[in-house]
């Protein structure tokens, strides 16, 4: 009930500003011609079938004047209207939001059973990487930082490690140190060059399941297992690193938390420049979005290299070209995915 008077609706029929219904006041039970004072959240008194809001009444001595007729059931919430007995509130794997906590508490669940956040060790690798002020031939480490923040956004708990040099013994020790985590992620050293040592190290310690995927950018990705701990080996080029993290690490984190990764938010847009792709490869194009005469238009970024990090940071979304296609033509309507949403 709301703050007001519980009544029998029939007693208020015809009530108005000039001819209010006059009712007596009772303490507990509503009967013909009598009303009981109620407050927000109160149980409806016996005998009542409606509530008149307090602002639609005036108290005159031991009586009230009602200036607005009530209909049966007015301002009354039936038991079970919010949550019914036996009703399932959430599916397994649902991520609890602030509003969920309020609902759970309202039905008496103060400590819901939840899955632990998956723990993820993020290990950036490469002897050329430094934290700041790079000398000629050196590069500031960004991949590990980026991936660790994505891990947190996707519901994991990341440990962002210091850079490990391109040395088999050092890489082996770094991976073994993080076997206490639910997932190990490395960045860099995933290809087949002289300094790309991580796939071999993982194969020595456990099993290398995949080395190379049909994605562009992002072909030199690898997946393995060491002592039942998944190892995701991401490329060193920043764009390729992000693409593979979204495609492989994101669903893994959601799976370990007991759920499935939700679809990325997406919107339809008209492509204003052709996007090319190689058949048999899934290509991801970065695009900027703009509204032109009420129509959403997607413009592929001109910087398409897998090492141009600004092309990701300044993009509004991604267009995925499926494996069977050779691309999209100018003017085609495409789905633009937002990978930066909080999911």
Regions found by a protein language model. Name each.
Residues 193-205:
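Short Gly/Thr/Asp-enriched flexible loops that form oxyanion-binding sites at enzyme active sites
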Residues 8, 37-39, 67, 91, ...:
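Short beta-strand segments
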Residues 64, 83, 203-343:
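Flexible glycine/proline-rich
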Residues 12, 41-42, 127-128, 189-192, ...:
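Short glycine-rich anion-binding loops that position phosphate/pyrophosphate groups of nucleotides
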Residues 75-186:
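Phosphate-binding glycine-rich loops and their immediate beta-loop-alpha structural context
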Residues 13-17, 28-31, 44-46, 58-59, ...:
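Solvent-exposed alpha-helices and their adjacent loops that cap or buttress functional pockets
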Residues 1-110:
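Phosphate-interaction motifs
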């Amino acid at each position: 009930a709301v703050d007001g008077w519980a009544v029998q609706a029939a007693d208020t029929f015809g009530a108005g500003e000039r001819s209010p219904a006059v009712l007596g006041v009772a303490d507990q039970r509503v009967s013909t011609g009598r009303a009981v004072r109620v407050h927000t959240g109160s149980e409806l008194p016996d005998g009542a079938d409606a509530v008149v809001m307090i602002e639609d009444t005036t108290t005159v001595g031991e009586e009230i004047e009602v200036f607005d007729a009530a209909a049966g059931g007015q301002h009354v919430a039936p038991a079970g209207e919010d949550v019914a007995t036996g009703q399932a509130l959430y599916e397994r794997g649902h991520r609890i939001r602030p509003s969920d906590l309020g609902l759970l508490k309202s039905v008496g669940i103060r400590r819901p059973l939840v899955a632990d956040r998956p723990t993820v060790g993020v290990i950036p690798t490469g002897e050329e990487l430094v934290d700041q002020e790079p000398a000629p031939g050196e590069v500031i480490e960004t991949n590990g930082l980026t991936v660790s923040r994505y891990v947190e956004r996707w519901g994991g708990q990341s440990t962002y490690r210091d850079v490990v040099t391109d040395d088999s013994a050092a890489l082996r020790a770094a991976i073994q140190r993080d076997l206490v985590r639910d997932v190990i992620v490395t960045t860099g050293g995933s290809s087949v060059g002289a300094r790309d040592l991580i796939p071999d190290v993982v194969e020595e310690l456990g099993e290398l399941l995949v080395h190379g995927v049909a994605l562009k950018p992002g072909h030199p990705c690898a997946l393995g297992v060491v002592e039942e701990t998944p190892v995701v080996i991401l490329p060193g080029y920043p764009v390729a690193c992000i693409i593979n993290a979204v495609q492989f690490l994101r669903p893994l984190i959601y799976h370990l938390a007991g759920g499935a990764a939700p679809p990325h938010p997406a919107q339809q847009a008209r492509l204003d420049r052709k996007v090319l792709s190689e058949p048999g490869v899934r290509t991801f194009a970065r695009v900027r979005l703009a509204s032109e005469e009420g129509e959403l238009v997607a413009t592929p970024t001109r910087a398409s290299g897998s090492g141009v990090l600004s092309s990701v940071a300044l993009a509004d979304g991604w267009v995925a070209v499926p494996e069977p296609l050779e691309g999209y033509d100018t003017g085609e309507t495409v789905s633009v995915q937002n990978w930066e949403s909080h999911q």
